[in-house]
Amino acid sequence: MGMYRGQIFGKKEIGLHWQAHKHAADHADDVGKENRMPVAICLGGPPPVMFSAISPLPDNLSEYEFAGLLNKRRLRITKCLTNDLWVPAEVDFVIEGYTIPGETRTEGPFGDHFGYYCLEEEYPVAVVLTVLLFVLLFCTCS
């Protein structure tokens, strides 16, 4: 999990802005340049999830565990529909897809969430397979 910027290129393509020193780049290296890498882009959700996504955690502590610690309860997760990834169950939207092996596009320029300005650079492209709206149902009894 991490917080990465995405640039919409069309109805089914998103540029994924991750730098070489981020975990997403490590995952892409593990998958290899010839293989698709599944992605799940989560939008919204509880503040502990967003905070854990940007926190520089040690490798032996997952972002999901840290979000649960911050929230004082286990984080509920659910499996994606189009791949084997797991996402927090309390996010608002999930965009599922995969990276296109070896394909990059020019992404940017943008200001990032740390307040810095990023110039145009080549970054991976994801193909969107589905967009899911998560609805939590609340029941009150009197």
PLM regions with names:
Residues 45-142:
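Charged, compositionally biased interaction regions
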